[in-house]
Structure formats: structure tokens, C-alpha cells
């Protein structure tokens, strides 16, 4: 599996690491992914999902079902 959020699709960002002498080198800024077991109320079951912490925060605010529908994700595949 790739290092991407299964709900939002967030993945690594290409950036630059800049030293004190201003030498720039390429660097990957990875997404903060967490494996979580969340209760899906509509499906009446637990779903194991690899999601970003930003998505987890949004789920706590609006709920798993509403957040998944707004991102066009079918929770039946988890």
C-alpha cells in the first residue's frame, strides 16, 4: 500500500531542505498517517483505515459517515 490517506488521498509533498549556508536539497514531507479502527454507525461495524491525522480530526468533528460521503469514499470496502 502507498503512503496515502485512504479517505482524503493526501500523500507526500516535495519540498526543499535548506541548510544554514542556504544549500537546498530535495526532501519529501510525508503525511502523518495512523492506522485506526473506527466505528461505522451506519454499517454497524468496525472499519480499519489508514488515515491522516487531519482527516481524523475532521472525522471527530463531523462523523465518519458524513466525512466519507463528502470525499466520495465507500466504507463497504474496508
Swiss-Prot record:
It comes from Prochlorococcus marinus (strain AS9601). InterPro entries: Ribosomal_bL28 (IPR026569), Ribosomal_bL28/bL31-like_sf (IPR034704), Ribosomal_bL28_bact-type (IPR001383), Ribosomal_bL28_sf (IPR037147). Keywords: Ribonucleoprotein, Ribosomal protein. Belongs to the bacterial ribosomal protein bL28 family. GO terms for biological process: translation. HAMAP family: Ribosomal_bL28 (MF_00373). This is Large ribosomal subunit protein bL28. GO terms for cellular component: ribonucleoprotein complex; ribosome. Pfam families: Ribosomal_L28 (PF00830). The keyword Ribonucleoprotein applies. It comes from the Bacteria. PANTHER family: 39S RIBOSOMAL PROTEIN L28, MITOCHONDRIAL, LARGE RIBOSOMAL SUBUNIT PROTEIN BL28M.
Amino acid at each position: 500500500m502507498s503512503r496515502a490517506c485512504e479517505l482524503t488521498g493526501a500523500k507526500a509533498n516535495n519540498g526543499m531542505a535548506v541548510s544554514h549556508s542556504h544549500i537546498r536539497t530535495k526532501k519529501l514531507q510525508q503525511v502523518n498517517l495512523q492506522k485506526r479502527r473506527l466505528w461505522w454507525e451506519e454499517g454497524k461495524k468496525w472499519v480499519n483505515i489508514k488515515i491522516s491525522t487531519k482527516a481524523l480530526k475532521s472525522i471527530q468533528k463531523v462523523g465518519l459517515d458524513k466525512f466519507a460521503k463528502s470525499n466520495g469514499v465507500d466504507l463497504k470496502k474496508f
